[in-house]
């Protein structure tokens, strides 16, 4: 947020809002909301993962699914603030995989990254400045915009 790109998008949005307000000859009220908020991720909280081909990392960048040997997982995530959940603990959150497809995608581990942190697996090239998710209290605040032409 507050980047040049962000300001350009806000300007476009404000122009659209004005056009919507001016297009109707009737009194209208418009409400815009999102499913959840957005947080900035500062450089010092971005963690680039270094791991071998013996680990498979997928899923979200803050609730990271991992397949591989536990010792390799612990080594890869040793410097990153968060909590490692093992497969038996995941079943309390995700339920047990009930068919062959779910078993094929069910992870060995899930690493839950602490608030304000994010991980970058090797396969991810995007340089995120923020994160649109729902893990932190800040992200649970739903942005709502209201405007009317009367």
Feature locations, PLM:
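Feature captures the catalytic ectodomains and active-site-proximal regions of enzymes
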Residues: 1-150
């Amino acid at each position: 947020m507050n980047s040049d790109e962000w300001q350009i998008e806000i300007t476009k949005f404000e122009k659209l809002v004005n056009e919507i307000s001016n297009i109707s000859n009737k009194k209208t009220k418009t409400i815009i909301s999102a499913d959840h908020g957005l947080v900035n991720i500062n450089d010092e909280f971005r963690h680039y993962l270094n791991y071998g081909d013996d680990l498979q990392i997928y899923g979200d960048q803050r609730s990271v699914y991992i397949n591989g040997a536990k010792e390799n997982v612990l080594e890869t995530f040793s410097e990153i603030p968060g909590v490692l959940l093992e497969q038996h603990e995941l079943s309390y959150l995700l339920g047990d995989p009930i068919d062959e497809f779910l078993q094929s995608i069910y992870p060995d581990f899930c690493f839950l990254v602490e608030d304000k942190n994010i991980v970058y697996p090797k396969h991810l090239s995007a340089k995120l400045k923020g994160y649109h998710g729902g893990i932190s209290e800040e992200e649970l605040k739903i942005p709502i915009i209201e405007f009317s032409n009367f």
